[in-house]
Design a protein with these regions (language model features):
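Short linker/helix segments within small regulatory modules
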Residues: 22-37, 55
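Charged, low-complexity interaction regions
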Residues: 147-153, 180-188
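Short amphipathic alpha-helical heptad-repeat segments
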Residues: 161-173
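Short, non-ligating residues that shape and space the ligands of small metal-coordination modules
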Residues: 9-13, 49-50
Length: 195
């Protein structure tokens, strides 16, 4: 794989199946938007790697699938991936575990809609999901303002002072931890400075 910015070669691990019970850390990375991210060692650009994803949670009987549109995967390729993922998961389940829900996984057009469904299954309301998205957006805008200078940052902080609360700082802390986990120390440092 080559960096789209500087064309330097890079290596990255790609996750295509998440079993929430066996790998809760992958579920956390998915929810934080850090799944299948790579960092170019040459220019430092963060790269989102497009890959199909099969999400499974046996306790909640969830089977979700997402194919990024940019993959242009044919229907037969999608069905083959889903069949292979389903077979792999079924073999890992205990003999008496329910399996019917795996035969018709719910498909999602966007990764964000899949993440929303995971959060809803965890009991997170639509309102909380939207509030989280707004916090994430604000964090991104504050990071951009910080790069432009102290004046731009101060103006944006004043404008959104009521949104900068404990939940906001918890979101920043989660992003710092996720950034460190995937080796994005520059991003973690920027967020620490922002905090």
């Amino acid at each position: 794989m080559a960096c789209p910015s500087c064309r330097a070669p890079l290596r990255a691990s790609v996750v295509t199946i998440i079993d929430a019970a066996q790998h809760p850390e992958l579920k956390a990375r998915l929810i934080a938007g850090q799944l299948n991210m790579a960092m170019c060692p040459s220019c430092g650009m963060a790269i989102m790697i497009s890959a199909p994803l099969f999400y499974h949670d046996a306790a909640k009987q969830l089977a979700f699938v997402h194919f990024p549109q940019q993959l242009n995967a044919r229907q037969d390729e999608q069905e083959r991936f889903i069949g292979d993922a389903t077979a792999l998961i079924m073999r890992a389940l205990p003999p008496n575990a329910p399996r019917g829900y795996l035969l018709a996984p719910r498909r999602f057009l966007t990764l964000n809609s899949l993440i929303d469904a995971v959060l809803e299954a965890d009991g997170v309301s639509r309102e909380k999901i939207e509030a989280h998205r707004q916090r994430v957006d604000l964090i991104g805008r504050l990071a951009e303002a910080a790069e432009r200078g102290d004046e731009a940052l101060a103006a944006l902080v004043d404008q959104h002072r009521d949104a900068i609360n404990d939940e906001f700082f918890a979101a920043i802390d989660a992003f710092i931890a996720a950034s460190r986990q995937v080796g994005r120390d520059d991003s973690a440092q920027l967020l620490l400075a922002l905090r």
